[in-house]
């Protein structure tokens, strides 16, 4: 039993290290925007939802346009987000973009988390 607990602990450590390397939160992104850091923010929700409100400076790239990679940049980090914590579109987009050689992270909690944190919304 002890060996499997240690194995699980090692797997958990690796999982969370990987998660931290490839995810970021809305507050961190807000600070990056405020400081003028060079990041590309990619909204993978439907275009109609992007028009209702989005992260300031974000580019709309709904699923039907992922193959175009329009708006993605090779010279900086691309941060993708979708609707909410239980939405997997952001992770799916991130996998596809990473497979094409783009540096990419996912925003934890999606746009819902952005709103819950009371951050600025662009329209």
Where on the chain are the PLM-derived regions?
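Flexible, polar/low-complexity N-terminal or interdomain linker segments that lie immediately upstream
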Residues: 1-40, 45-49, 123
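Short amphipathic alpha-helix with an adjacent loop that forms part of the alpha/beta core around
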Residues: 32-33, 66-75
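Conserved beta-strand positions in the Rossmann-like core of class I SAM-dependent methyltransferases
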Residues: 40, 59, 105
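Short loop/helix-cap segments at secondary-structure boundaries that form the rim of catalytic
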Residues: 50-56, 69-73, 114
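Short, hinge-like loop/turn segments at secondary-structure boundaries
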Residues: 59, 77, 121-123
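Glycine-rich, highly charged phosphate/nucleotide-binding loops
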Residues: 59-67
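Catalytic cysteine-centered active loop of the rhodanese-like fold, especially the PTP/DSP P-loop
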Residues: 72-115
């Amino acid at each position: 039993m002890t060996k499997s607990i240690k194995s699980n602990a090692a797997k958990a450590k690796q999982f969370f290290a990987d998660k931290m390397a490839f995810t970021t939160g809305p507050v961190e992104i807000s600070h990056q925007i405020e400081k003028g850091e060079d990041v590309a923010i990619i909204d993978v929700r439907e275009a109609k939802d992007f028009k209702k409100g989005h992260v300031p400076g974000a580019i709309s790239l709904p699923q039907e346009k992922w193959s175009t990679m329009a708006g993605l940049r090779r010279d900086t980090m691309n941060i993708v987000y979708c609707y909410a914590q239980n939405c997997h579109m952001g992770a799916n987009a991130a996998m596809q973009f990473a497979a094409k050689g783009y540096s990419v992270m996912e925003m934890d909690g999606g746009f819902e988390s952005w709103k819950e944190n009371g951050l600025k919304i662009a329209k």
